[in-house]
Amino acid sequence: MKTYNVAIVGASGAVGQELIKGLENSFFPIKKFVPLASTRSAGKKIKAFNKDYEILETTHEVFEREKIDIAFFSAGGSVSEEFATSASKTALVVDNTSFFRLNKDVPLVVPEINAKEIFNAPLNIIANPNCSTIQMTQILNPLHLHFKIKSVIVSTYQAVSGAGNKGIESLKNELKTALECLEKDPTIDLNQVLQAGAFAYPIAFNAIAHIDTFKENGYTKEELKMLHETHKIMGVDFPISATCVRVPVLRSHSESLSIAFEKEFDLKEVYEVLKNAPSVAVCDDPSHNLYPTPLKASHTDSVFIGRLRKDLFDKKTLHGFCVADQLRVGAATNALKIALHYIKNA
């Protein structure tokens, strides 16, 4: 079997760490592993495959010098903008950032939906979709193929690790401060003691309806990503309206979905379609308190769906609640599936 030299740009970040775990736990045919990062992190040690690796600086030359075959980019859009094209001259690039997602020459891939697009990459770059988009499309696509979707309204409840290690540290530090203050004075106004860290407001004991920047139409970039990326991945144009909220959860994004179909539907058929959908786990027995939660979804590679029910007033509308580990399903696992599909079918 052919083996590959693999690089991860942003190896020390939250998604980079999940990529390493995924490579360690999969049957990925690795010949050489090269961790890459910024000048700030270069020279530091990182553990992978039961040994220590020195992080190299990301440069335009490093990919050719190290004979990289596959390069995963998870270090932010500006890094992908600067270095991905250089890497793609000698390596297949799988980019986890938003920079290339809507580029017409770069396929945007969820392998369970449009794996064939992996081989339609003239720039030798394949984009990994937004984490919230990946889990949503894995629910929408099988339903659309069976019932035909008319429109979607989605509200997200997104974990702090979606903002990387700085988001995790903000929640931990703010919770520590808040709990210490509440121990001294249970009636204290936390607005007076908590300071914003990685987010626009303190995230501890809070919910912030603000992910990415606001656009002139009142939507955030995150909300518009879910619209435009879904259209590109699924090849559809039905309306999608999103509201994205950051919540004080460490890991796994949740989404409340309201899906309007073109015709009335049978709820039993919905269950059958989703039970047979790849990477989807139906978790739905409210009488026994069985429904998706972020804790249950964390450290898994499934999109959990539950609370499935017909709208009380519109027989064509389905409601549901889906949860997935955004660091795995929404980033690392999807990227690895792209690379593995490429290797097996090239």
Curated annotation (Swiss-Prot):
One of its GO terms (molecular function) is NADP binding. GO terms for biological process: 'de novo' L-methionine biosynthetic process; diaminopimelate biosynthetic process; isoleucine biosynthetic process; lysine biosynthetic process via diaminopimelate; threonine biosynthetic process. Substrate binds at residues 158, 246. Keywords: Amino-acid biosynthesis, Diaminopimelate biosynthesis, Lysine biosynthesis, Methionine biosynthesis, NADP, Oxidoreductase, Threonine biosynthesis. Coiled coil: none annotated. Its EC number is 1.2.1.11. The active site is at 131 (acyl-thioester intermediate), 253 (proton acceptor). It holds the Pfam family Semialdhyde_dh. InterPro entries: Asp-semialdehyde_DH_CS, Asp_semialdehyde_DH, Asp_semialdehyde_DH_beta, NAD(P)-bd_dom_sf, Semialdehyde_DH_NAD-bd, Semialdhyde_DH_dimer_dom. The keyword Transit peptide does not apply. It catalyses: L-aspartate 4-semialdehyde + phosphate + NADP(+) = 4-phospho-L-aspartate + NADPH + H(+). The keyword GTP-binding does not apply. PROSITE patterns: ASD (PS01103). Phosphate binds at residues 101, 225. Belongs to the aspartate-semialdehyde dehydrogenase family. Catalyzes the NADPH-dependent formation of L-aspartate-semialdehyde (L-ASA) by the reductive dephosphorylation of L-aspartyl-4-phosphate. Homodimer. This is Aspartate-semialdehyde dehydrogenase. The gene is asd.
